UniProtKB/Swiss-Prot annotation:
Keywords: Cleavage on pair of basic residues, Disulfide bond, Growth factor, Lipid-binding, Metalloenzyme inhibitor, Metalloprotease inhibitor, Protease inhibitor, Secreted, Signal, Toxin. This is Venom nerve growth factor 2. Disulfide bonds join C139-C205, C181-C233, C193-C235. It comes from the Eukaryota. Gene3D superfamilies: Cystine-knot cytokines (2.10.90.10).
Length: 244
C-alpha cells in the first residue's frame, strides 16, 4: 500500500515539472516576453498620443494673475444695478465719452441720449466765478468732471472705484463732478475770504466734501458705496479775540 502511494506521488511531481510555464514565469528574452513588451510599448505610445491630444483640446489654465487682470479690465455689470433711482446722483455720471463742462455762465444739461446712463437726470452746474450785477463769490472755486480710481468710503476705508464697466457690450466710464477751491493754500493768511472784515475776523477758504453713491469693487463683484468727493469751496471765519 505504501509503495502505491509513493508511486502516485512521484507521478504527480513528474507531471507538474513537465507542465508548460505561465507567462509570469517566462524568462526574459523569450518570445512571450517580447510580445508583452511590444504590447506595453504600444499602449504607452497610445496613452501619450491621447494625453497630447487632450492638452491641445484643453489648454493649460491661465495664471491667477492673468485671470485677475482680465477680469479687472473687462468687468460686466448687471443692468439691474441702475434701475433703482436712489442710487442716482447728479454728481455721478456713466458715459461712453467725456461729459461737457459749463463755460461762459452756461449751465450743463444732460439730456436723454444713448451715451449716458443717467437718462433721468438733468444736472445743472455753473463754473465759478460768476459775475452778475456786481456779485462776487466769497471764495473762488473750480469745477470739473474727474475719474477716480480710489476713494474713502463712509466708514473711512479706502476702496477701489470702478473706472470702466461693461454694460450690454458697451464700455462706460464713471465720472464725478467735483468742486474745489481755485487756489488752495496751506497758509490761512494767503487764502483769506473775499469781503470779510479782517480787523474782526480771521478767514480762509477751504474745500469741503460730501458723500455720493458710486460703483465700487468689493472682492470680485460690483457694489454701490458712499464715497467722499470734493463738492464746494467755503469760507471759514474765526472771531479775533484780541479786540475783545
Amino acid at each position: 500500500m505504501s509503495m502505491l502511494c509513493y508511486t502516485l506521488i512521484i507521478a504527480f511531481l513528474i507531471g507538474t515539472w513537465a507542465a508548460p510555464k505561465s507567462e509570469d514565469n517566462v524568462p526574459l528574452g523569450s518570445p512571450a516576453t517580447s510580445d508583452l513588451s511590444d504590447t506595453s510599448c504600444a499602449q504607452t505610445h497610445e496613452g501619450l498620443k491621447t494625453s497630447r491630444n487632450t492638452d491641445q483640446r484643453h489648454p493649460a489654465p491661465k495664471k491667477a494673475e492673468d485671470q485677475e487682470l482680465g477680469s479687472v479690465a473687462n468687468i460686466i455689470v448687471d443692468p439691474k444695478l441702475f434701475q433703482k433711482r436712489r442710487f442716482q446722483s447728479s454728481r455721478v455720471l456713466f458715459s461712453t465719452q467725456p461729459p461737457p463742462l459749463s463755460r461762459d455762465e452756461q449751465s450743463v444739461e444732460f439730456l436723454d441720449n444713448e451715451d449716458t446712463l443717467n437718462r433721468n437726470i438733468r444736472a445743472k452746474r455753473e463754473n465759478h466765478p460768476v459775475h452778475n450785477q456786481g456779485e462776487h463769490s466769497v471764495c473762488d472755486s473750480v469745477s470739473d468732471w474727474v475719474i477716480k480710481t480710489t476713494a474713502t468710503d463712509i466708514r473711512g476705508n479706502v476702496v477701489t472705484v470702478m473706472e470702466d464697466i461693461n454694460l450690454n457690450n458697451e464700455v462706460y466710464k464713471q465720472y464725478f463732478f467735483e468742486t474745489k477751491c481755485r487756489n488752495p493754500s496751506p497758509n490761512p493768511v494767503q487764502s483769506e475770504c473775499r469781503g470779510i472784515d479782517s480787523r474782526l475776523w480771521n478767514s480762509y477758504c477751504t474745500t469741503t466734501q460730501t458723500f455720493v453713491r458710486a460703483l465700487t469693487m468689493e472682492g470680485n463683484q460690483a457694489s454701490w458705496r458712499f464715497i467722499r468727493i470734493d463738492t464746494a469751496c467755503v469760507c471759514v471765519i474765526i472771531r479775533k479775540t484780541d479786540n475783545f
